Amino acid sequence: ATTFETETRFDLVFSNAAIQWIPNHEELLTRLFNLLSENGTLAIQIPLFLDMPLGKIINKRANDDRWRAQTEGVLDLFTIHDVSFYYDILSKLFNSIEMWETNYMHVLNSHGSIMEMMSSTGLKPYLERLYSESDKNDFKEEVLKETIKAYPSQMNGKVLLPFKRLFFIGYK
């Protein structure tokens, strides 16, 4: 998205849980706007992972003395701003804007399922920086212990994981 060039203009440009990995959102949103046709629409969804209890648990563990040297700089990989940041950019570009936050309620079989799901998303950049498989397993175990406290099991043993998301749509 930061280097994509084309003369073609699109009626719809969308992103689902991707732009948090790309820096410079003001420049990025302007580039995406410029890809739109005269009456085009930009639709973006951003996971607000760092605002969730699970994101806070992972960051707390990462800042622990044992892990800090290995996980230093991970937060720099995430580019997530507050709603007003995005509104101010979009309002300069678009005629009409819709914005909202919501929680996707994931119903998972266990707390281990949370760890499995997060190992390929928000937990992944932390795990990639750890030196050994043993460190990765220890880190995940520490996160799991706190996750169990933050997300209690339901009566049927399932675990509810509300996953916070920001959506915005800009209409040219």
Predicted stretch roles:
Residues 2-13:
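A short acidic, Gly/Pro-enriched loop at the edge of an enzyme's catalytic core
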Residues 1-2, 105:
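Adenine-nucleotide cofactor-binding loop residues
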Residues 11-26, 48:
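A short SAM/SAH-binding and catalytic strip from SAM-dependent methyltransferases
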Residues 4, 21, 67, 78, ...:
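Tryptophan-centric aromatic hotspots in well-structured domains and transmembrane helices
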Residues 26, 33, 39-110, 125-128, ...:
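Conserved catalytic/acceptor-binding region of the Class I
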Residues 93-95, 116-172:
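C-terminal lobe and adjacent flexible extensions of AdoMet/dcAdoMet transferase-like proteins
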